[in-house]
């Protein structure tokens, strides 16, 4: 056998067996390149914004509409200030904060930013106050007992709504509740209109003193309270936070006694003296009567239980206690024995005061001003009107008796 032929057959290589089919070569030529590795999905803008907002403590939402730069808000947050902290700060404290920001971070605030920060804080305060007012409005419009209880704890609340609800429940009427709510809303609208009238009157008077404004406002409020009930002379009823107690008796339960009520008037006198001392130190005009300034000072001092509606509501009861303590104590014992509520006792306090005014020429203002503890209080308009009415009745009775020649008329004190 030829060795060359053997080696040639052994090492013979057929290139056609090693080459791929033409179709596969074409597929390999046109095949797309492998895709790049997948990137992580982009973070949503809302999520990123919420993270930034959390880092700034809500300052970006507070400042974004007032031209404050993002870096400025970020540095304020870095100093540890939050929205709630800024809302509770005074203007002087805000100025100190902005000065500290400039000194610590060497960051010069623009003039518009300084004003914008204060404007944003004022706008946020107004928004929160409006939300609080709307919340209270919804609370009242619900007509629930809890809302009335909350108002009675604060001071005084209107009782006709509660009385109408009781009548509606007693009569079994299902649709009258909405009418009660509408009536309550109408009363609030009337009160707002009255406040606008009082404010307009102050602007017209111009140079009138603060105490004259207080006295005028007090008289107008009393007039409206008297004439609210269908134009009659019956006074608006209220939910009273007190109960009738005898002298020296300590009240039990949630409500306080009458000794506590009279003690509140003594506290008001102390607060007035403090306000007068502060005014003298500052060289300002000193108030001579218990005005809104005194009530605001009492609230700042922590005596939030002393408020203007409550103290003005019972001032004639305190006047009877000061002018004739024996008659006041006898009236308290009589109403306590009969189980009467404090509203009936309050109405009964008018008659002895009118009798005292009758013995002193019907001049109830002079009687108040002559007493050291009553001189700081305004005379209730209803008490003044009752004295005027009884004086007219007495004069008419005297004139008729002199004309007819008959006997003199008796005591014509009206029933309160």
From Swiss-Prot:
Keyword S-adenosyl-L-methionine part of the UniProt annotation? no
The site annotation (Interaction with DNA) covers 285, 292, 296, 343
Where does this protein reside within or beyond the cell?
A: Nucleus
What residue spans carry the Acidic residues bias annotation? 210-225
Can you name one GO molecular function term for this protein? Answer: DNA binding
Where do the record's region annotations for Disordered lie? 154-237
Q: Name one GO biological process term.
A: regulation of DNA-templated transcription
Query: What residue ranges does this record give for the DNA-binding region?
Result: 238-242, 307-314, 378-381
| Pfam families named among the record's database cross-references | C_LFY_FLO, SAM_LFY
Keywords, comma-separated and alphabetical:
Activator, Developmental protein, DNA-binding, Nucleus, Transcription, Transcription regulation
Q: Main localisation, per the record?
A: nucleus
Domain of life where this protein originates:
Eukaryota
A cellular component term from Gene Ontology for this protein is:
nucleus
Give the UniProt tissue specificity note.
Expressed in floral meristems and in indeterminate vegetative meristems.
Function, as annotated = Probable transcription factor that act to specify determinacy in the progenitor cells for both flowers and leaves.
**Xref: PANTHER family:** PROTEIN LEAFY
What family does the entry list? Belongs to the FLO/LFY family.
Name of protein: Floricaula/leafy homolog 2
What's the source species for this entry? Nicotiana tabacum
Gene symbol here is: FL2
């Amino acid at each position: 056998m030829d060795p060359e032929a053997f080696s040639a057959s052994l090492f013979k290589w057929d290139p056609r067996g090693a080459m791929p089919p033409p179709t596969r070569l074409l597929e390999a030529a046109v095949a797309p390149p492998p895709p790049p590795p997948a990137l992580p999905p982009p973070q949503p803008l809302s999520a990123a914004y919420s993270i930034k907002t959390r880092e700034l403590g809500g300052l970006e939402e507070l400042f974004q509409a007032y031209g404050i730069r993002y870096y400025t808000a970020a540095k304020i947050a870095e100093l540890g200030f939050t929205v709630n902290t800024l809302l509770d700060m005074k203007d002087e404290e805000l100025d100190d904060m902005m000065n500290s920001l400039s000194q610590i971070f060497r960051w010069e605030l623009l003039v518009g930013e300084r004003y914008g920060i204060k404007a944003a804080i004022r706008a946020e305060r107004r928004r929160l106050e409006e939300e609080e007012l709307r919340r209270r409005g919804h609370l009242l419009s619900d007509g629930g007992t809890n809302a009335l209880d909350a108002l009675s704890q604060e001071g005084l609340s209107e009782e006709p709504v509660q009385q109408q609800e009781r009548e509606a429940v007693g009569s079994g009427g299902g649709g009258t509740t909405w009418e009660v709510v509408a009536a309550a809303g109408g009363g609030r609208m009337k009160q707002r209109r009255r406040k606008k009238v009082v404010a307009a009157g102050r602007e017209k008077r111009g140079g009138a003193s603060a105490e004259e404004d207080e006295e005028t406002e007090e008289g107008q409020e009393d007039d409206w309270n008297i004439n609210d009930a269908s134009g009659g002379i019956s006074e608006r009823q209220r939910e009273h936070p007190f109960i009738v107690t005898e002298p020296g008796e300590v009240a039990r339960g949630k409500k306080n006694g009458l000794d506590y009520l009279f003690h509140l008037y003594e506290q008001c006198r102390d607060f007035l003296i403090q306000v007068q001392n502060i005014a003298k130190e500052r060289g300002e005009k000193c108030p001579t009567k218990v005005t809104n300034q005194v009530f605001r000072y009492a609230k700042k001092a922590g005596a939030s239980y002393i408020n203007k509606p409550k103290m003005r509501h019972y001032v004639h009861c305190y006047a009877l206690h000061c002018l004739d303590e024996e008659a006041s104590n006898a009236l308290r014992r009589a109403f306590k024995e009969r189980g009467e509520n404090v509203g009936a006792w309050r109405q009964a306090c008018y008659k002895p005061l009118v009798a005292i005014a009758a013995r002193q020429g019907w001049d109830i203002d002079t009687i108040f001003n002559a007493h050291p503890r009553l001189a700081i209080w305004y005379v209730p308009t209803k008490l003044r009107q009752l004295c005027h009415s009884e004086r007219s009745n007495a004069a008419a009775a005297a004139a008729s008796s002199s004309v007819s020649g008959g006997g003199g008329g008796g005591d014509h004190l009206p029933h309160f």
